[in-house]
Every structure is written in structure tokens, then in C-alpha cells.
């Protein structure tokens, strides 16, 4: 196989490296580690962090791309498939390759729509055909309930065995987590819930379509897991674009004041006066026109979809920095009047050194709180933009495209509800975990909130 590094792959690896570096810096500085210990002592924060790490792990696995090798021809030269795959695709191959003809309900053994079937005696009747893969191992369909129960119990047993293999050594050596008992309990219970769910899915997914299939017969569970990367990337990469603009302009406006402050205020006031959805839609349509007129820029469809996703992150970042910039401007106006900042200016310390050593450390809590609180909003923004047709590439799997595809399915009779339900369930868990973690981070890092409580 030939490794492939897309633009968003490199950026997500950069973000992971930055997160690891941030953890190392925090552990080496007591004044930085103290508030994060308060976060780690909160059971809700620990549980939410474990869920977010699980989603992030899936996104990273889906960012390790490659092009599979084709059988060697007569020339002996290595040939590679034009389709770009990921490590997650390789892991999900047992369910990705099990494609049916069209819709089927969760755990169904027959298609959702009737078709003309020719019987053994030559008669043609309209009935629900048997699925090729869903329950295809069953000789008698009446055994389905017992088979699902048996496989679910095996999956639960496997998940519990893995959990015990992790928990018992850590508990015996008392190194589970250097925080309170409540956080330890939340950590291990959350890991247990994730492992039990994973065990059940591993046991059932190769034999049944757990969340059914869509219009083209694709397994909805596979599409939902592949959509996680898009949601995580939208939230993470947009933040990567937002932070430099918000920090640079917001802190500069508050510290220097005068004309700099006037220009920055005029800039974000003008941006806020433009309806956000219209501004984003106009920018996306311009970008889409540019990509369609230059198809020679891309070797594969995955590269084209990836570049569109990257541009969408850039557009969202350049239109969402105003709120954080306004908060940083207000906080910097207060910090610049503190005694140690005034003393530094009196001793001739340069403005750049004052900003780096005195101002930025005192506004970092606002940055961190804003980052974690905006993440969930950006995930929802992708769903809304894809729903109105100006989101990610239609061929890319995402929660927004799944919801957009389910819109017409809800209007048919009988209703095809499972694609919308699957996208809603996974997006709900991701956004809820992000919101709960953001609330805990805000409570731990905001000094005003701690004093008032």
C-alpha cells in the first residue's frame, strides 16, 4: 500500500502533537497544573473526557490514509488503487463490504421494500426478499431473537473481560488515577460502558445491520462511524484558524488601544452585521466554483473532498473569531492597568515581551474556556450547513449529509427513520460530552466563577 497524507490529516496530527505538548508543559508548571487538577477531580469532567478521547481516537484512525496495492501486472511495477482508504476502513471492512440492495431496518433479515420474487414453481409474487448479509447465516428466521441475544451476551462478556484485564492490575497497584475516588469511579465506569458497547457491536455487526442500511444498501453503522472524523475535524481545525485571529486582534486592541482598537472594533462589528449563514454560504459557493473549474488539481476524489473540508474550516474560523476577540479585548483592557504591567512599561520592557509574559498568561483561561465551549457549536454548524447544501462535499460521510439524506426518507411511507436516529445518537453523545467537559473546564479555570461560588 502507498501512504497518503491529506491536508486535514497533517493538521489533525499537528493538533494531536500540540495537545501532547500542552499536557507536558502543564505537568511541568504547578500554577498551570493546579486548575487542571480541579478538572480531573470532577467525575463529570473525567467521564466526558473519556468519551471525547474515544471519538478523537476514531477520528485519528480515520486520518491514517493509504491507497491499497493492486495485483502486480506483467511489467512487475507496483500499481495502486485510485480510491483512498483509511485504517478505520480496514478495521470496519467486515461491515463496509456487506452492502445490500437498498433499505433494511435495524437487525432485519429482509429488505424494507417489496420486490417481485420468482418462486421455485415459476410463480411471481411481491414479497420482502431476504437480505444477502443481514441474518444471512440463519437457516430459520425465527431463530433471530435468540441469536441476537446470544451474540450480545458474548459481546458483553468480551467487553467485561477486557475491562477486568485493565482494571484489576491498576486497582492492585493503586495507580488508576491520581485524583479522588469519585473521579476514579467515573473513569472506570465510563470505560466499562464503552467497552461493553464496543463488544456488543463487534459481536453483532458482522452478522446484522445494527442500524440498518440506507438507500444504496450501505451499512448505517459504518457511515456513522466514518462521520465522526468530519465532525471532530470541523470543531478542531476551525479552532486552529480562530485562535490566531482572535488572540492577535483581541489582545492587540485591548493593550494598544487608540487606532488599533478602533480598527479591530470596526472589523468585528462589520462582520457581526453580516448574517453568518449567508456569509459562509457565499464563501463556500465561491470556493466550490473554483474547485470545479480546476479538476486537474486533484488526483483522487478524496483529495477534492478533503480540500473542500479544509476550506470550510478556514471559512468558519474566519467568521467565528469575533466573539473570542471581544472577550479578550475586554480582559486585556483590565490586565494592562495592573501594577506589574505598568511597572514593566516603566522599566522599558518591550511591548512584545509584556504581551507574552504578562498579558497572555492572564487571559489564557478565557481562551481555553472559549475553545472547549465552541467545539460543540461547530459540530452542530457542520450539520446545519450540510443540511442547507453548503457544507462538506456531498460524497463525504458526515452527520450533516446523513441528516440531509434522511430528510426525504422521513417523507416516504413507511418512514425510514434509522439513518436520522443513528446520526442524531452519535452527534448527541459527542456534543453532550463536549458541553459537559466545557462546563467543568469553565468552572475550574474561571477565577470569577470560583470566587462567586
Language-model segments: what does each one mean?
Residues 1-238, 242, 391, 395, ...:
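Gly/Trp-centered helix-boundary motif
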Residues 34, 44, 167-170, 177, ...:
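Alpha-helical transmembrane segments of integral membrane proteins
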Amino acid at each position: 500500500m502507498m501512504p497518503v497524507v491529506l491536508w486535514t490529516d497533517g493538521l489533525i496530527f499537528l493538533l494531536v502533537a500540540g495537545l501532547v505538548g500542552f499536557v507536558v508543559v502543564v505537568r511541568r508548571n504547578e500554577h498551570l497544573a493546579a486548575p487542571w487538577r480541579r478538572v480531573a477531580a470532577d467525575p463529570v469532567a473525567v467521564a466526558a473526557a473519556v468519551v471525547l478521547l474515544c471519538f478523537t481516537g476514531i477520528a485519528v484512525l480515520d486520518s491514517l490514509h493509504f491507497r491499497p496495492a493492486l495485483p502486480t501486472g506483467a511489467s512487475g511495477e507496483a500499481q495502486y488503487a485510485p480510491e483512498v482508504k483509511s485504517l478505520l476502513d480496514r478495521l470496519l471492512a467486515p461491515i463496509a463490504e456487506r452492502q445490500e440492495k437498498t433499505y433494511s431496518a435495524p437487525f432485519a433479515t429482509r429488505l424494507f421494500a417489496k420486490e417481485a420474487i420468482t418462486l421455485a414453481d415459476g410463480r411471481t409474487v411481491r414479497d420482502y426478499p431476504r437480505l444477502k448479509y443481514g441474518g444471512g447465516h440463519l437457516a430459520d428466521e425465527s431463530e433471530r431473537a435468540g441469536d441476537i441475544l446470544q451474540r450480545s451476551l458474548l459481546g458483553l462478556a468480551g467487553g467485561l473481560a477486557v475491562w477486568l484485564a485493565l482494571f484489576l492490575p491498576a486497582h492492585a497497584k493503586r495507580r488508576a488515577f491520581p485524583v479522588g475516588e469519585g473521579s476514579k469511579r467515573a473513569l472506570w465506569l465510563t470505560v466499562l460502558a464503552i467497552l461493553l458497547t464496543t463488544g456488543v457491536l463487534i459481536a453483532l455487526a458482522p452478522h446484522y445491520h445494527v442500524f440498518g442500511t440506507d438507500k444504496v444498501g450501505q451499512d448505517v453503522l459504518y457511515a456513522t462511524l466514518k462521520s465522526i472524523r468530519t465532525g471532530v475535524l470541523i470543531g478542531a481545525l476551525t479552532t486552529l484558524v480562530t485562535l490566531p485571529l482572535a488572540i492577535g486582534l483581541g489582545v492587540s486592541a485591548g493593550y494598544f488601544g487608540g487606532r488599533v482598537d478602533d480598527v479591530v472594533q470596526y472589523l468585528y462589528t462589520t462582520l457581526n452585521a453580516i448574517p453568518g449563514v449567508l456569509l459562509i454560504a457565499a464563501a463556500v459557493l465561491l470556493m466550490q466554483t473554483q474547485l470545479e473549474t480546476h479538476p486537474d488539481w486533484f488526483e483522487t476524489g478524496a483529495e477534492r473532498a478533503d480540500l473542500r473540508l479544509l476550506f470550510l474550516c478556514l471559512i468558519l474560523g474566519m467568521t467565528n473569531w469575533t466573539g473570542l476577540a471581544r472577550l479578550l479585548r475586554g480582559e486585556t483592557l483590565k490586565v494592562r492597568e495592573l501594577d506589574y504591567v505598568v511597572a514593566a512599561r516603566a522599566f522599558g520592557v518591550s511591548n512584545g515581551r509584556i504581551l507574552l509574559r504578562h498579558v497572555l498568561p492572564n487571559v489564557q483561561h478565557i481562551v481555553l474556556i472559549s475553545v472547549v465551549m465552541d467545539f460543540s457549536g461547530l459540530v452542530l454548524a457542520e450539520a446545519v450547513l450540510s443540511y442547507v447544501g453548503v457544507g462538506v462535499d456531498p460524497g463525504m460521510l458526515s452527520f450533516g449529509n446523513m441528516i440531509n439524506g434522511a430528510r426525504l426518507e422521513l417523507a416516504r411511507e413507511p418512514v425510514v427513520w434509522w439513518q436520522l436516529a443513528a446520526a442524531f445518537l452519535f452527534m448527541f453523545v459527542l456534543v453532550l460530552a463536549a458541553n459537559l467537559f466545557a462546563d467543568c473546564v469553565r468552572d475550574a479555570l474561571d477565577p470569577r466563577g470560583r470566587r462567586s461560588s
